[in-house]
């Protein structure tokens, strides 16, 4: 399948550069995955689309301030490091710039020596394995010295780093935020709970591959980056109870979707406690096994994320919805507006 089938025209001014002042004031497009019908709402209207017995699945990963600026100890040359994945102990898979200056044995110093890293291995596209040394607690030092790794399409400086975290972020380890969750406030989540909507939490640590474009000409040639996920026994039991009682499982974001669909695929359609690495790639033709609805942002043209949404809601429906979003001047990407995709006609008949 040609990746150009997932292209659409997006004016640059619709790429949201900063978050809205209030999280829940973003707009919400409601898309019926079966009919393609569209409604234009605000995010707080999600309350009227979710019912007692439904369950929202939220990714409680926390974004690391994963971008570090340091200098080579021997020459003083500036080096930028982006942490991608913790491998073992203090060893990390990273991206460095300029990569040609960092060879095996190179030592990089950050914060006037408060944190140091030695290159222990190299990979393609600027990939380097670094082993860190420090006194104290690594994540406290990282919090002091690091910057939030905003996506490349965001050019503005983020004034408040908490705005690139969900209000329920807990498990540190992501190089990017699960952005569909950025729309929720603690007050909105409380209102949903009061209505009888269950909240379930999983963890998937978002990797930098989220921003990497599909370089292959066809979908089938593309290989997804692997990301670590975890679902507890408590969450699995809750989701199974929801299913048994006729409720719907609504994932907040593509990361929650990938987690549930990975587990269901690996366990004959069942949801159970599991941890591991997933490189699942969902595109039209994929049959969903776990979810009934999806809350997600508006994604990049030709991205694996728009392919996932197209697998769930039909490519023609999704591209029509995206063209409507452009026409109605919705805000796109990480700090943009949201879409709620489900079989809404069936839902209204409940």
Swiss-Prot record:
Superkingdom of origin: Bacteria
GO process annotations (BP): queuosine biosynthetic process; tRNA wobble guanine modification
Catalytic activity as recorded in UniProt: 7-aminomethyl-7-carbaguanosine(34) in tRNA + S-adenosyl-L-methionine = epoxyqueuosine(34) in tRNA + adenine + L-methionine + 2 H(+)
The reply to whether Cell membrane figures as a keyword in the UniProt entry is no
GO molecular function annotations of the record: S-adenosylmethionine:tRNA ribosyltransferase-isomerase activity
Q: Which SUPFAM superfamilies match?
A: QueA-like (SSF111337)
Q: In which pathway does it act?
A: tRNA modification; tRNA-queuosine biosynthesis
Q: Where in the cell is it found?
A: Cytoplasm
Q: What is its EC number?
A: 2.4.99.17
Keywords from the UniProt entry: Cytoplasm, Queuosine biosynthesis, S-adenosyl-L-methionine, Transferase
Q: What is its main location?
A: cytoplasm
Q: Which Pfam families match?
A: Queuosine_synth
User: Which GO terms of the cellular component aspect does the record hold?
Assistant: cytoplasm
Top enzyme category: transferase
- Family statement drawn from the similarity comment of this UniProt entry: Belongs to the QueA family.
Describe the task this protein carries out: Transfers and isomerizes the ribose moiety from AdoMet to the 7-aminomethyl group of 7-deazaguanine (preQ1-tRNA) to give epoxyqueuosine (oQ-tRNA).
- Quaternary structure? Monomer.
Mind telling me what this protein is named?
Answer: S-adenosylmethionine:tRNA ribosyltransferase-isomerase
